[in-house]
């Protein structure tokens, strides 16, 4: 029987204590098999004094304030929802179009446990001009749309000309195959989105989505954050903008191309390869997953994000790294306060009037 996975903001299926997961081969046959086999459980090693000292430095980063440029910042310990989240009267309000995609028709992810239905939610701003290629956000886990968080933010910020007139494409994950989709360090998920999701979005909504990578942003939290960076890293010709909360840049799902999973980003990919035209906003929380785990395990979310930020700085990327005090993994109160300003940073340089 088909299942409908309605995944909203607070639902993050990250296994913080599991052993490393070997990736399946990125082929339709593998994607439709029995799912990824998990490696043996391995006990976590306690963080060393040096690890804890490195993490402690994050609390002393300068405060993240409106207008902050590139660099490393901190926020908290107290939080309040951003005013942009509140629905305003007297401004144009976008509409929400929703439909289901049945995995049985997918050549990439037909379902590890059989066919299922995946919800796709599309925000279309009232100012969108039919036929004009629209910049857009692609978001994992249907982040923030069904509870109107992101829709309200976009309504308000588009009306105030702080963001371009943009579409938001929110796609539910594949349930039991979420890690296969998001944690696999390869172009497979990005290609799935390009060939199977975005064409359906255009067909169902009548919206034309831009092919300009400057007008495309990938967004997610936890493994979805890793997915967002993976989409832009492997398909830079399609995505130049990335937004990540508590990104799972750790050794979670291995493959020959990525022996240490998404930890390859801070460890090898960014250090060893030429600078790509990416603009990245990334976050990690004080009490994020694995915060007391040794850096040598490559399973400490705080240290992994901290090290990725360090590499981005050294390589000269446009990036912001925000460390949130008194907060946990993909903490809703942090997102509620920071998302509008994060979006504004990520979309810097893109004309508000569009292209």
At which residue positions do the language-model features occur?
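Non-catalytic cap/lid and distal C-terminal segments of serine-dependent acyl enzymes
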Residues: 31, 35-355
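Signal peptide processing junction and immediate N-terminal pro/mature segment
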Residues: 18-29
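Bacterial N-terminal signal peptides
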Residues: 8-17
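Bacterial N-terminal signal peptides that target proteins for export
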Residues: 1-8
